[in-house]
Amino acid sequence: MAASASPMASQLRSSFSSASLSQRLAVPKGISGAPFGVSPTKRVSSFTVRAVKSDKTTFQVVQPINGDPFIGSLETPVTSSPLIAWYLSNLPGYRTAVNPLLRGVEVGLAHGFFLVGPFVKAGPLRNTAYAGSAGSLAAAGLVVILSMCLTIYGISSFKEGEPSIAPSLTLTGRKKQPDQLQTADGWAKFTGGFFFGGISGVTWAYFLLYVLDLPYFVK
C-alpha cells in the first residue's frame, strides 16, 4: 500500500508545483485579452539617474558686504559699482576731508537756488505781480525751517565734547580719520553753513530772475 501510494503522492506533488509555478509565471495579457508576445532574444535596457555635483562654483549677486552679515548692509552690483562709489564720494555729505561748514554752504546753495522756482510757479500768488517776491520769501522760509530741523537733530543726536561716532575704518579695513560732521561742533557748523548757503541761493535766484531780468521759464 505504501509502495503504491508513493508514486501517486509524487505525481500529485509535481502537479501542484507545476500549477503554482504556472500561476506565478502567468503571461500578461493586453486590453483585448491577447497575451503579450515576449521575445526571448529581445534585450531590455535600463538607465540610472544620478545627481552629480558641478565643479563650477556659483556666485551670489546680492550678498552681505565683506561677507559679514552682522554689518547690516548688502553688497549689490549697484552699491559695489566703482561708478556709484565715485558719485557718492563726490557728494558734499560724503566728502569727509572738507570742513563741515563748507559742506553745509554747498548743500544750502543748491537747495535755496532750486526752491525758488517751484514756489514762484506753484505758490498761491503765482498769477499776480508779486509771484517772484512771494515765491522767494517762501523759499527762504523753508530754508529757515530746514535749518531749525537740522539744529534739533544735532542737539538730540550729538553731545558736546564727545568724539565722532563715525567709523574709523573703511569697508576694506583701512584706517581713516573719523568724519567730523558726526560731532556736535561739526554738525553745528554744517547747520550754520546750510542756513547761510540756503539764503544766499534764494537771493541769487531772485537776483537772476527779477533784477537782471534774465529770460528764464520760471518767471
Curated annotation (Swiss-Prot):
Example of a GO biological process term: photosynthesis
Membrane topology, as annotated: Multi-pass membrane protein
Any one Gene Ontology molecular-function term assigned to this protein's record: protein domain specific binding
Domain of life assignment: Eukaryota
Keyword Transmembrane helix: yes
Keyword Transmembrane: yes
Record topological domains on the Lumenal side: 156-191
Transit peptide (residue range): 1-50
Ranges facing Stromal side: 51-134, 213-219
Compartment(s): Plastid, Chloroplast membrane
Any one GO cellular component localisation term in the record: chloroplast envelope
Keywords linked to the UniProt accession: Chloroplast, Membrane, Photosynthesis, Photosystem I, Plastid, Transit peptide, Transmembrane, Transmembrane helix
TM helices/strands, residue ranges: 135-155, 192-212
Coarse class of the protein's main subcellular location: plastid
Pfam families: PsaL
InterPro entries, A to Z: PSI_PsaL, PSI_PsaL_sf, PSI_suXI
Family: Belongs to the PsaL family.
Quaternary organization: Interacts with CURT1B and PSAO.
Name the UniProt record assigns to this protein: Photosystem I reaction center subunit XI, chloroplastic
